[in-house]
Protein backbone atom coordinates (compact mmCIF):
# COMPACT_ATOMS: atom_id res chain seq x y z
CA UNK A 1 0.00 0.00 0.00
CA UNK A 2 1.25 3.46 -0.83
CA UNK A 3 2.37 5.56 2.09
CA UNK A 4 1.98 9.35 2.12
CA UNK A 5 5.07 11.56 2.18
CA UNK A 6 6.51 13.18 5.28
CA UNK A 7 5.51 16.74 4.51
CA UNK A 8 2.70 18.71 6.10
CA UNK A 9 0.08 20.13 3.72
CA UNK A 10 -3.17 22.07 3.98
CA UNK A 11 -6.55 20.86 2.72
CA UNK A 12 -9.89 22.57 3.45
CA UNK A 13 -8.32 24.40 6.38
CA UNK A 14 -6.95 21.31 8.18
CA UNK A 15 -3.39 20.10 8.48
CA UNK A 16 -2.48 16.94 6.63
CA UNK A 17 0.16 14.89 8.37
CA UNK A 18 1.73 11.95 6.62
CA UNK A 19 2.80 10.36 9.88
CA UNK A 20 1.18 10.88 13.25
CA UNK A 21 1.82 8.59 16.19
CA UNK A 22 -1.30 7.56 18.03
CA UNK A 23 -1.85 7.71 21.74
CA UNK A 24 -2.04 4.17 23.06
CA UNK A 25 -4.77 4.83 25.57
CA UNK A 26 -7.46 7.39 26.22
CA UNK A 27 -9.84 7.81 29.14
CA UNK A 28 -12.93 7.63 26.93
CA UNK A 29 -11.80 4.97 24.45
CA UNK A 30 -10.86 4.94 20.77
CA UNK A 31 -13.63 4.92 18.15
CA UNK A 32 -13.31 3.68 14.57
CA UNK A 33 -15.75 5.68 12.44
CA UNK A 34 -16.26 4.19 8.98
CA UNK A 35 -17.43 6.21 5.99
CA UNK A 36 -16.24 4.28 2.97
CA UNK A 37 -18.05 5.93 0.09
CA UNK A 38 -17.63 9.59 0.95
CA UNK A 39 -15.20 11.67 3.01
CA UNK A 40 -16.52 13.99 5.73
CA UNK A 41 -14.25 16.77 4.48
CA UNK A 42 -15.72 16.73 0.97
CA UNK A 43 -17.82 19.74 -0.03
CA UNK A 44 -21.54 19.02 0.64
CA UNK A 45 -23.58 19.24 -2.54
CA UNK A 46 -20.78 17.82 -4.69
CA UNK A 47 -21.10 14.24 -5.92
CA UNK A 48 -22.30 12.02 -3.09
CA UNK A 49 -21.41 14.50 -0.34
CA UNK A 50 -24.31 15.87 1.66
CA UNK A 51 -25.77 15.95 5.14
CA UNK A 52 -24.12 12.67 6.13
CA UNK A 53 -20.69 14.21 5.58
CA UNK A 54 -21.57 17.13 7.84
CA UNK A 55 -23.00 14.72 10.42
CA UNK A 56 -19.88 12.55 10.58
CA UNK A 57 -17.45 15.44 10.76
CA UNK A 58 -19.48 17.44 13.30
CA UNK A 59 -20.19 14.55 15.67
CA UNK A 60 -16.59 13.33 15.43
CA UNK A 61 -15.24 16.75 16.37
CA UNK A 62 -17.60 16.94 19.34
CA UNK A 63 -16.72 13.40 20.43
CA UNK A 64 -13.05 14.35 20.27
CA UNK A 65 -13.80 17.32 22.52
CA UNK A 66 -15.41 14.89 24.98
CA UNK A 67 -12.14 12.97 25.22
CA UNK A 68 -12.58 10.16 22.70
CA UNK A 69 -9.85 9.33 20.20
CA UNK A 70 -11.69 9.22 16.86
CA UNK A 71 -10.27 7.75 13.66
CA UNK A 72 -12.51 8.24 10.61
CA UNK A 73 -11.77 5.78 7.81
CA UNK A 74 -12.71 6.74 4.25
CA UNK A 75 -11.64 5.67 0.76
CA UNK A 76 -8.86 7.76 -0.78
CA UNK A 77 -9.94 9.57 -3.96
CA UNK A 78 -6.85 11.73 -4.61
CA UNK A 79 -3.15 10.99 -4.26
CA UNK A 80 -2.63 14.47 -2.78
CA UNK A 81 -4.83 13.77 0.23
CA UNK A 82 -2.11 12.23 2.37
CA UNK A 83 -2.52 9.20 4.58
CA UNK A 84 -3.68 10.95 7.75
CA UNK A 85 -5.57 14.22 8.09
CA UNK A 86 -5.61 15.75 11.57
CA UNK A 87 -9.04 17.40 11.81
CA UNK A 88 -8.71 18.43 15.45
CA UNK A 89 -7.09 17.23 18.66
CA UNK A 90 -8.17 13.57 19.08
CA UNK A 91 -9.78 13.41 15.61
CA UNK A 92 -8.03 11.98 12.54
CA UNK A 93 -9.20 11.20 9.03
CA UNK A 94 -7.54 8.10 7.57
CA UNK A 95 -7.52 7.84 3.77
CA UNK A 96 -7.45 4.17 2.77
CA UNK A 97 -6.35 3.26 -0.75
CA UNK A 98 -8.90 0.83 -2.18
CA UNK A 99 -9.07 0.75 -5.96
CA UNK A 100 -8.26 3.63 -8.30
CA UNK A 101 -8.56 7.19 -7.02
CA UNK A 102 -10.98 8.10 -9.81
CA UNK A 103 -13.26 6.36 -12.25
CA UNK A 104 -15.43 4.27 -9.93
CA UNK A 105 -19.09 5.18 -9.59
CA UNK A 106 -20.88 4.82 -6.27
CA UNK A 107 -22.58 1.71 -7.65
CA UNK A 108 -19.17 0.14 -8.31
CA UNK A 109 -17.70 0.84 -4.88
CA UNK A 110 -18.93 -2.43 -3.31
CA UNK A 111 -16.28 -4.18 -5.43
CA UNK A 112 -13.67 -2.47 -3.23
CA UNK A 113 -15.09 -3.37 0.19
CA UNK A 114 -12.56 -6.16 0.73
CA UNK A 115 -9.63 -3.92 -0.25
CA UNK A 116 -10.97 -1.15 1.99
CA UNK A 117 -11.40 -3.50 4.95
CA UNK A 118 -7.91 -4.89 4.41
CA UNK A 119 -6.53 -1.35 4.44
CA UNK A 120 -8.17 -0.60 7.78
CA UNK A 121 -6.81 -3.81 9.29
CA UNK A 122 -3.32 -3.00 7.99
CA UNK A 123 -3.50 0.53 9.39
CA UNK A 124 -4.50 -0.67 12.85
CA UNK A 125 -1.71 -3.25 12.85
CA UNK A 126 0.98 -0.86 11.62
CA UNK A 127 -0.06 1.90 14.03
CA UNK A 128 -0.44 -0.63 16.87
CA UNK A 129 -3.84 0.75 17.83
CA UNK A 130 -6.96 -0.99 19.03
CA UNK A 131 -10.50 0.29 19.08
CA UNK A 132 -13.21 0.20 21.74
CA UNK A 133 -16.10 0.50 19.30
CA UNK A 134 -16.96 0.80 15.60
CA UNK A 135 -19.50 3.33 14.30
CA UNK A 136 -20.33 2.68 10.64
CA UNK A 137 -22.26 5.02 8.37
CA UNK A 138 -24.27 3.89 5.30
CA UNK A 139 -24.70 0.31 4.17
CA UNK A 140 -21.29 -0.25 2.54
CA UNK A 141 -19.53 0.90 5.68
CA UNK A 142 -21.92 -1.24 7.69
CA UNK A 143 -20.74 -4.35 5.87
CA UNK A 144 -17.11 -3.39 6.52
CA UNK A 145 -17.90 -2.65 10.16
CA UNK A 146 -19.62 -6.00 10.58
CA UNK A 147 -16.46 -7.88 9.58
CA UNK A 148 -14.22 -5.68 11.75
CA UNK A 149 -16.61 -6.14 14.66
CA UNK A 150 -16.15 -9.90 14.53
CA UNK A 151 -12.39 -9.61 13.97
CA UNK A 152 -11.73 -7.10 16.75
CA UNK A 153 -14.48 -8.40 19.07
CA UNK A 154 -15.82 -4.92 19.79
CA UNK A 155 -19.40 -3.61 19.46
CA UNK A 156 -20.67 -2.08 16.23
CA UNK A 157 -22.99 0.92 16.18
CA UNK A 158 -24.51 1.59 12.76
CA UNK A 159 -26.28 4.58 11.24
CA UNK A 160 -27.86 3.88 7.85
CA UNK A 161 -28.76 7.51 6.98
CA UNK A 162 -30.83 6.20 4.05
CA UNK A 163 -32.48 2.83 3.43
CA UNK A 164 -33.19 1.10 0.12
CA UNK A 165 -36.78 0.13 0.92
CA UNK A 166 -37.62 3.60 2.20
CA UNK A 167 -36.12 5.27 -0.88
CA UNK A 168 -37.92 2.86 -3.19
CA UNK A 169 -41.24 3.56 -1.51
CA UNK A 170 -41.03 7.26 -2.41
CA UNK A 171 -39.26 7.45 -5.76
CA UNK A 172 -39.46 10.56 -7.87
CA UNK A 173 -40.77 10.07 -11.40
CA UNK A 174 -37.98 8.66 -13.56
CA UNK A 175 -35.72 7.75 -10.63
CA UNK A 176 -34.01 4.36 -10.62
CA UNK A 177 -34.87 2.11 -7.65
CA UNK A 178 -32.20 0.83 -5.30
CA UNK A 179 -31.16 -2.77 -6.06
CA UNK A 180 -32.22 -5.80 -4.07
CA UNK A 181 -28.55 -6.50 -3.28
CA UNK A 182 -28.42 -3.31 -1.20
CA UNK A 183 -31.58 -4.30 0.66
CA UNK A 184 -30.04 -7.67 1.52
CA UNK A 185 -26.85 -6.02 2.79
CA UNK A 186 -28.88 -3.62 4.93
CA UNK A 187 -30.87 -6.49 6.40
CA UNK A 188 -27.66 -8.29 7.36
CA UNK A 189 -26.37 -5.17 9.12
CA UNK A 190 -29.64 -4.72 10.99
CA UNK A 191 -29.46 -8.34 12.11
CA UNK A 192 -25.84 -8.16 13.29
CA UNK A 193 -25.02 -4.65 14.53
CA UNK A 194 -25.11 -4.18 18.29
CA UNK A 195 -26.88 -0.81 18.16
CA UNK A 196 -28.70 1.06 15.41
CA UNK A 197 -28.79 4.86 15.52
CA UNK A 198 -31.40 6.87 13.62
CA UNK A 199 -32.09 10.59 13.36
CA UNK A 200 -35.81 10.56 14.15
CA UNK A 201 -38.64 8.41 15.46
CA UNK A 202 -39.77 8.06 11.84
CA UNK A 203 -36.39 6.50 11.06
CA UNK A 204 -36.88 4.06 13.91
CA UNK A 205 -40.33 3.14 12.64
CA UNK A 206 -38.89 2.50 9.16
CA UNK A 207 -36.28 0.09 10.53
CA UNK A 208 -38.89 -1.82 12.49
CA UNK A 209 -41.45 -1.92 9.67
CA UNK A 210 -39.21 -2.58 6.66
CA UNK A 211 -36.35 -4.55 8.27
CA UNK A 212 -38.00 -6.13 11.33
CA UNK A 213 -35.42 -4.47 13.58
CA UNK A 214 -35.65 -4.92 17.33
CA UNK A 215 -36.83 -1.54 18.67
CA UNK A 216 -34.85 -2.16 21.86
CA UNK A 217 -31.64 -1.99 19.80
CA UNK A 218 -32.50 1.35 18.14
CA UNK A 219 -31.54 4.76 19.53
CA UNK A 220 -32.84 8.10 18.25
CA UNK A 221 -30.17 10.82 18.17
CA UNK A 222 -31.21 14.18 16.76
CA UNK A 223 -28.53 15.77 14.55
CA UNK A 224 -27.51 19.35 15.11
CA UNK A 225 -26.46 22.48 13.28
CA UNK A 226 -23.60 24.91 13.65
CA UNK A 227 -25.54 27.89 14.97
CA UNK A 228 -22.34 29.93 15.14
CA UNK A 229 -21.87 29.46 11.38
CA UNK A 230 -25.55 29.75 10.48
CA UNK A 231 -27.20 32.72 12.15
CA UNK A 232 -29.43 35.61 11.04
CA UNK A 233 -27.58 38.40 9.30
CA UNK A 234 -28.18 42.11 9.56
CA UNK A 235 -30.06 43.98 6.85
CA UNK A 236 -26.70 45.20 5.57
CA UNK A 237 -25.34 41.64 5.45
CA UNK A 238 -28.42 40.49 3.56
CA UNK A 239 -28.01 43.30 1.04
CA UNK A 240 -24.34 42.41 0.60
CA UNK A 241 -25.24 38.74 0.04
CA UNK A 242 -27.78 39.68 -2.61
CA UNK A 243 -25.37 41.94 -4.42
CA UNK A 244 -22.71 39.21 -4.42
CA UNK A 245 -25.25 36.73 -5.80
CA UNK A 246 -26.57 39.17 -8.40
CA UNK A 247 -30.06 39.24 -6.91
CA UNK A 248 -32.19 42.43 -6.95
CA UNK A 249 -32.49 43.88 -3.46
CA UNK A 250 -36.28 44.12 -3.56
CA UNK A 251 -37.02 40.76 -5.19
CA UNK A 252 -38.60 37.88 -3.31
CA UNK A 253 -36.00 35.12 -3.26
CA UNK A 254 -36.65 31.37 -3.01
CA UNK A 255 -33.57 29.18 -2.50
CA UNK A 256 -32.99 25.47 -3.03
CA UNK A 257 -29.86 23.99 -1.43
CA UNK A 258 -28.91 20.39 -2.09
CA UNK A 259 -27.73 17.86 -4.61
CA UNK A 260 -29.29 18.21 -8.04
CA UNK A 261 -31.09 14.90 -8.32
CA UNK A 262 -34.77 14.08 -8.63
CA UNK A 263 -34.92 12.57 -5.15
CA UNK A 264 -34.31 16.07 -3.76
CA UNK A 265 -37.16 17.49 -5.86
CA UNK A 266 -35.64 20.46 -7.73
CA UNK A 267 -38.02 19.68 -10.61
CA UNK A 268 -40.96 20.15 -8.22
CA UNK A 269 -39.76 23.61 -7.22
CA UNK A 270 -39.11 24.72 -10.80
CA UNK A 271 -42.57 23.62 -11.94
CA UNK A 272 -44.12 25.35 -8.93
CA UNK A 273 -42.32 28.59 -9.75
CA UNK A 274 -43.53 28.36 -13.36
CA UNK A 275 -47.05 28.00 -11.98
CA UNK A 276 -46.55 31.04 -9.74
CA UNK A 277 -45.24 33.20 -12.57
CA UNK A 278 -48.11 32.17 -14.84
CA UNK A 279 -50.65 33.36 -12.26
CA UNK A 280 -48.67 36.40 -11.11
CA UNK A 281 -46.44 37.42 -14.03
CA UNK A 282 -45.67 40.86 -12.61
CA UNK A 283 -44.17 39.71 -9.30
CA UNK A 284 -40.44 40.22 -8.86
CA UNK A 285 -39.35 36.69 -8.01
CA UNK A 286 -35.90 35.11 -8.10
CA UNK A 287 -34.84 31.50 -7.53
CA UNK A 288 -31.40 30.34 -6.39
CA UNK A 289 -30.56 26.67 -7.04
CA UNK A 290 -27.39 25.81 -5.10
CA UNK A 291 -25.85 22.36 -5.58
CA UNK A 292 -24.25 19.97 -8.02
CA UNK A 293 -25.48 16.86 -9.84
CA UNK A 294 -25.37 13.60 -7.90
CA UNK A 295 -26.65 10.05 -8.06
CA UNK A 296 -29.00 9.55 -10.99
CA UNK A 297 -28.56 13.25 -11.78
CA UNK A 298 -25.03 12.60 -13.04
CA UNK A 299 -26.48 11.00 -16.18
CA UNK A 300 -28.04 14.36 -17.15
CA UNK A 301 -26.03 17.09 -15.41
CA UNK A 302 -27.94 19.94 -17.12
CA UNK A 303 -31.39 18.40 -16.64
CA UNK A 304 -32.71 21.14 -14.37
CA UNK A 305 -31.18 24.03 -16.30
CA UNK A 306 -32.90 22.56 -19.36
CA UNK A 307 -36.18 22.27 -17.46
CA UNK A 308 -36.04 25.90 -16.32
CA UNK A 309 -35.51 26.96 -19.93
CA UNK A 310 -38.34 24.74 -21.19
CA UNK A 311 -40.66 26.22 -18.55
CA UNK A 312 -39.70 29.74 -19.61
CA UNK A 313 -38.41 30.74 -16.17
CA UNK A 314 -34.67 30.62 -16.83
CA UNK A 315 -34.33 34.45 -16.69
CA UNK A 316 -35.31 34.40 -13.00
CA UNK A 317 -33.47 31.21 -11.99
CA UNK A 318 -29.78 31.17 -11.14
CA UNK A 319 -27.86 27.92 -10.68
CA UNK A 320 -25.01 28.14 -8.18
CA UNK A 321 -22.16 25.71 -7.60
CA UNK A 322 -21.99 24.02 -4.20
CA UNK A 323 -20.22 26.16 -1.65
CA UNK A 324 -18.60 25.79 1.79
CA UNK A 325 -20.58 26.64 4.95
CA UNK A 326 -19.17 30.15 5.30
CA UNK A 327 -20.46 30.98 1.80
CA UNK A 328 -23.62 28.89 2.08
CA UNK A 329 -24.74 30.97 5.05
CA UNK A 330 -24.95 34.00 2.75
CA UNK A 331 -27.28 32.07 0.40
CA UNK A 332 -29.64 31.32 3.29
CA UNK A 333 -29.56 34.95 4.42
CA UNK A 334 -30.17 36.24 0.90
CA UNK A 335 -33.30 34.09 0.63
CA UNK A 336 -36.78 34.97 1.85
CA UNK A 337 -37.78 31.29 1.72
CA UNK A 338 -35.85 28.02 1.48
CA UNK A 339 -37.69 25.24 -0.36
CA UNK A 340 -37.04 21.55 0.37
CA UNK A 341 -39.28 19.45 -1.92
CA UNK A 342 -37.43 16.18 -1.19
CA UNK A 343 -39.12 12.83 -1.64
CA UNK A 344 -37.25 11.54 1.39
CA UNK A 345 -34.94 13.03 4.03
CA UNK A 346 -33.65 11.05 6.99
CA UNK A 347 -33.43 14.36 8.87
CA UNK A 348 -33.14 17.50 6.77
CA UNK A 349 -29.98 19.34 7.77
CA UNK A 350 -30.60 22.11 5.22
CA UNK A 351 -33.87 22.89 6.99
CA UNK A 352 -32.10 23.41 10.32
CA UNK A 353 -29.31 25.50 8.76
CA UNK A 354 -31.82 27.70 6.94
CA UNK A 355 -33.91 28.24 10.07
CA UNK A 356 -30.80 28.98 12.13
CA UNK A 357 -30.10 31.68 9.54
CA UNK A 358 -33.53 33.18 10.19
CA UNK A 359 -35.16 31.97 6.97
CA UNK A 360 -38.51 30.13 6.98
CA UNK A 361 -38.70 26.80 5.17
CA UNK A 362 -41.34 25.29 2.90
CA UNK A 363 -40.72 21.54 2.84
CA UNK A 364 -42.30 18.25 1.93
CA UNK A 365 -43.95 16.34 4.73
CA UNK A 366 -41.47 13.49 4.30
CA UNK A 367 -38.95 11.60 6.42
CA UNK A 368 -37.53 13.67 9.25
CA UNK A 369 -38.68 17.06 7.93
CA UNK A 370 -41.74 17.20 10.24
CA UNK A 371 -39.24 17.09 13.12
CA UNK A 372 -36.91 19.77 11.82
CA UNK A 373 -39.72 22.19 10.91
CA UNK A 374 -42.44 23.49 13.23
CA UNK A 375 -45.32 23.49 10.74
CA UNK A 376 -47.11 26.82 10.66
CA UNK A 377 -44.61 28.43 13.03
CA UNK A 378 -41.11 28.20 11.51
CA UNK A 379 -42.24 27.07 8.07
CA UNK A 380 -44.84 25.18 6.07
CA UNK A 381 -45.07 21.45 5.37
CA UNK A 382 -46.59 20.45 2.03
CA UNK A 383 -48.30 17.11 1.51
CA UNK A 384 -47.04 15.43 -1.63
CA UNK A 385 -45.18 16.86 -4.60
CA UNK A 386 -47.87 18.36 -6.81
CA UNK A 387 -46.35 21.59 -8.21
CA UNK A 388 -49.73 23.32 -7.86
CA UNK A 389 -49.77 22.65 -4.10
CA UNK A 390 -46.21 23.86 -3.83
CA UNK A 391 -47.04 27.00 -5.77
CA UNK A 392 -49.89 27.74 -3.36
CA UNK A 393 -47.70 27.29 -0.27
CA UNK A 394 -44.82 29.35 -1.63
CA UNK A 395 -47.07 32.11 -2.95
CA UNK A 396 -48.79 32.40 0.44
CA UNK A 397 -45.48 33.38 2.03
CA UNK A 398 -44.40 35.58 -0.86
CA UNK A 399 -47.62 37.58 -0.51
CA UNK A 400 -47.57 37.94 3.30
CA UNK A 401 -44.49 39.81 4.47
CA UNK A 402 -45.58 39.93 8.12
CA UNK A 403 -46.18 36.18 8.31
CA UNK A 404 -42.94 35.40 6.53
CA UNK A 405 -40.90 37.67 8.81
CA UNK A 406 -42.55 36.22 11.92
CA UNK A 407 -41.79 32.70 10.73
CA UNK A 408 -38.15 33.68 10.19
CA UNK A 409 -37.92 34.91 13.78
CA UNK A 410 -39.55 31.72 15.06
CA UNK A 411 -37.26 29.65 12.86
CA UNK A 412 -34.16 30.86 14.69
CA UNK A 413 -35.62 29.81 18.04
CA UNK A 414 -36.72 26.44 16.67
CA UNK A 415 -33.30 25.69 15.19
CA UNK A 416 -31.57 26.40 18.49
CA UNK A 417 -32.83 23.08 19.90
CA UNK A 418 -30.57 21.17 17.48
CA UNK A 419 -26.98 21.00 18.73
CA UNK A 420 -24.02 18.87 17.62
CA UNK A 421 -22.71 18.93 21.18
CA UNK A 422 -26.00 17.43 22.36
CA UNK A 423 -25.85 14.84 19.58
CA UNK A 424 -22.34 13.82 20.65
CA UNK A 425 -23.31 13.52 24.31
CA UNK A 426 -26.16 11.21 23.34
CA UNK A 427 -23.84 9.15 21.14
CA UNK A 428 -21.37 8.97 24.02
CA UNK A 429 -24.05 7.45 26.26
CA UNK A 430 -24.82 4.87 23.57
CA UNK A 431 -21.14 4.08 23.09
CA UNK A 432 -20.51 3.64 26.82
CA UNK A 433 -23.48 1.31 27.15
CA UNK A 434 -22.41 -0.75 24.12
CA UNK A 435 -18.80 -0.96 25.32
CA UNK A 436 -19.93 -2.04 28.78
CA UNK A 437 -22.13 -4.80 27.36
CA UNK A 438 -19.64 -5.83 24.68
CA UNK A 439 -20.51 -7.25 21.25
CA UNK A 440 -23.43 -9.63 21.28
CA UNK A 441 -22.71 -13.14 20.11
CA UNK A 442 -24.93 -14.81 17.53
CA UNK A 443 -24.41 -18.42 16.65
CA UNK A 444 -26.09 -20.21 13.80
CA UNK A 445 -26.53 -20.03 10.06
CA UNK A 446 -28.90 -17.04 10.14
CA UNK A 447 -26.17 -14.44 10.86
CA UNK A 448 -25.67 -13.79 7.15
CA UNK A 449 -29.20 -14.55 6.09
CA UNK A 450 -30.86 -12.80 3.16
CA UNK A 451 -34.38 -12.66 4.50
Curated annotation (Swiss-Prot):
It holds the Pfam family Glycos_transf_1. Homodimer. It comes from the Bacteria. Belongs to the glycosyltransferase group 1 family. MshA subfamily. Mg(2+) binds at residues 332-333, 335, 359. Catalyzes the transfer of a N-acetyl-glucosamine moiety to 1D-myo-inositol 3-phosphate to produce 1D-myo-inositol 2-acetamido-2-deoxy-glucopyranoside 3-phosphate in the mycothiol biosynthesis pathway. The gene is mshA. This is D-inositol 3-phosphate glycosyltransferase. Keywords: Glycosyltransferase, Magnesium, Metal-binding, Transferase. One of its GO terms (molecular function) is D-inositol-3-phosphate glycosyltransferase activity. It is an enzyme of class 2 (transferase). The keyword Magnesium applies.
Amino acid sequence: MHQAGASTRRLHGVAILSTLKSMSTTPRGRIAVISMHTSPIEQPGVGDAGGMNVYIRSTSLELGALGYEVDIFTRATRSSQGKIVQLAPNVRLINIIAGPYEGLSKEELPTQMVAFTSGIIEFAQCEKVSYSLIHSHYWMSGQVGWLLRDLWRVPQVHTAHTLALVKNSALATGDRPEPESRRICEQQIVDNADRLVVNTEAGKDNLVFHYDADPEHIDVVLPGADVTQFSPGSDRATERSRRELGVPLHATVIAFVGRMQRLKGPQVLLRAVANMMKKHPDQELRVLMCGGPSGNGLARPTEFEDLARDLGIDPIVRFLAPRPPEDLASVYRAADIVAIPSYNESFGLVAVEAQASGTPVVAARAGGLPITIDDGTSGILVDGHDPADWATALQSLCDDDDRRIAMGENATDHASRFSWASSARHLSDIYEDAIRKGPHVRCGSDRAGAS
